């Protein structure tokens, strides 16, 4: 069973279907012409071989052909309680557990001085800056795989800009965010990025690439460990209640579960790009807010970022994320 979307300027009708260069009968639901942007299901009674690659060619009534490579043939995903529980456990392991591990350093970090605070806040900026570039790159890559009618790259830029401006407006209400409010914005930005990670893992498992999915789980888990430290940094001089830490961990890591479900059951490149664009805009807003907080704390303006402790934190944050990202690049 295959989902087909019409991306051309005119309605189209599928006349014939080839699988591995052989013509096969098919059933289209709903039948008839496929209007621009619409989708239909094609059921082809072909003896699919689980795990094998197949080439599918659609021939329209005008003679135009469209070929798609099915890298791994797998059954069409169906929603079951057991499957949702399994994916939720993986999402928690990837998203929530590493965040909680990082937050556990909170008691140890509370004793740091101003230099240590500068380092940790700069570390946070470094982590988030890498996530910003990573989210934008993945969003544009997915946008390039979407149908032309979605205008993928333009959509990514507009959605990211709108998200950034909206969150900046919300964040500035009542003054620049500090303490727990700033930690909440950091957790939100990281959570939206983790939504994209969940999409990638879910899509890998849905495509039958269990090895790749397991590889991504382990890599993203290692990749996310320091994010908890970044979330805790703004509240080191405060004493937030325990429930606040639980909420921050769920906000930052919980979206990975949602991403797993969406990626395995209803993944499409345009919606993946849309979600990652929101994440990129949110992360950019957090980078700006944390940077402004560091400058206010040191009262040196842009010269603040020339301090050794801050330069060291920025470098350490970017370097750690870059090195651990190597475990999830294929």
Regions found by a protein language model. Name each.
Residues 17, 29, 132:
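Surface loops and adjacent helix of pleckstrin homology
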Residues 1, 13-14, 53, 129:
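A broad structural signal for short, well-ordered beta-strand segments within beta-sheet-rich domains
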């Amino acid at each position: 069973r295959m989902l087909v979307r019409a991306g051309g300027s005119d309605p189209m009708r599928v006349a014939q279907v080839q699988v591995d260069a052989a013509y096969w009968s098919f059933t289209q639901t709903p039948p008839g012409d496929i209007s621009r942007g619409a989708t239909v299901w094609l059921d082809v009674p072909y003896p699919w071989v689980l795990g094998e690659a197949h080439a599918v060619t659609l021939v329209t009534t005008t003679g135009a052909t469209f070929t798609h490579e099915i890298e791994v043939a797998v059954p069409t995903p169906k929603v079951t309680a057991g499957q949702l529980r399994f994916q939720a456990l993986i999402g928690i392991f990837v998203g929530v557990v590493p965040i909680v591990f990082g937050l556990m350093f909170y008691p140890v970090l509370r004793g740091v001085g101003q230099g240590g605070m500068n380092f940790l806040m700069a570390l946070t900026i470094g982590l988030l800056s890498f996530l910003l570039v990573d989210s934008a790159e993945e969003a544009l890559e997915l946008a390039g795989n979407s149908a032309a009618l979605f205008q993928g790259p333009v959509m990514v830029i507009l959605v990211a800009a709108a998200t950034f401006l909206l969150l900046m407006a919300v964040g500035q209400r009542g003054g620049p965010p500090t303490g727990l409010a700033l930690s909440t914005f950091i957790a939100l930005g990281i959570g939206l990025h983790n939504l994209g990670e969940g999409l990638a893992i879910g899509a890998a498992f849905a495509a039958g690439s269990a090895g790749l999915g397991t590889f991504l789980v382990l890599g993203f888990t290692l990749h996310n460990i320091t994010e908890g430290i970044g979330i805790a940094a703004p509240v080191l001089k405060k004493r937030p209640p325990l429930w606040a830490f639980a909420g921050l961990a769920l906000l930052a890591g919980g979206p990975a579960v949602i991403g797993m479900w969406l990626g395995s059951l209803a993944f499409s490149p345009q919606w993946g790009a849309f979600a990652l664009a929101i994440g990129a805009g949110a992360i950019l807003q957090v980078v700006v807010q944390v940077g402004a907080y560091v400058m206010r704390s040191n009262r040196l303006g842009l010269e603040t970022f020339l301090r050794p402790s801050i330069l060291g934190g920025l470098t350490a944050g970017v370097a750690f994320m870059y090195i651990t990202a190597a475990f999830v690049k294929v």
